[in-house]
């Protein structure tokens, strides 16, 4: 069994200004963070430079999205090369808000994953079902189909973290119970064992995203197949430190 390093990503989404983010970064920089936890903060693209220069080197920086090619006439998009040039090492791809607010489909997300990895960015690849899909009993069908397209575009799984984010639990205050999260993570790990390899199944970090707070993070972190979190709103608050230290 591979030892999987606990991973906590903070997705700032479209929030903050220089003043508030500087205050947040100062709080993180002076906090006692569990050394066995990998921490990544995903800043709005316009603040990537600001975040990288302002955060302690023990905290990595991610972009929240990128495009599938290196350059060109794609107004408003940013490339993995640009993200790297700002000093960031990670990118979030396939987030439910990109899928459901901006209409990104599995094929496009797969192409983005492939290009980001080719460009030497590490990827937080997101999957997850909507409430109606869970209620219809199709959770596995949905997340396995999403995972399949991502997997077709990954050559090196060492640079990928898979984030399971039930869409019904994002920003709603609803959270999957620790048992619900563990059940899905366990099924995902079994999918990788059956479809990719035993080695990838054992080593791949599968993290949970969906209204993670200081109040529920420890119980979620205690689950065997939950290897960390992708945190939204709480990553902008001091409680993010408690979430980072959920396994301390």
Swiss-Prot record:
PROSITE patterns the record matches: TIM_1 (PS00171), TIM_2 (PS51440)
An annotated Gene Ontology molecular function: methylglyoxal synthase activity
GO CC term, one of those recorded: cytosol
This protein's record includes keyword Lyase: yes
Residue sites binding substrate per the record: 11, 13
Active site per the UniProt annotation: 95, 165
Keywords attached to this entry: Cytoplasm, Gluconeogenesis, Glycolysis, Isomerase, Lyase
UniProt record, GO biological process: gluconeogenesis; glyceraldehyde-3-phosphate biosynthetic process; glycerol catabolic process; glycolytic process; methylglyoxal biosynthetic process
Subcellular location: Cytoplasm
Protein family according to the UniProt entry: Belongs to the triosephosphate isomerase family.
Entry function: Triosephosphate isomerase is an extremely efficient metabolic enzyme that catalyzes the interconversion between dihydroxyacetone phosphate (DHAP) and D-glyceraldehyde-3-phosphate (G3P) in glycolysis and gluconeogenesis. It is also responsible for the non-negligible production of methylglyoxal a reactive cytotoxic side-product that modifies and can alter proteins, DNA and lipids.
Quaternary structure (record): Homodimer.
This protein's name: Triosephosphate isomerase
Record lineage: Eukaryota, Metazoa, Chordata, Craniata, Vertebrata
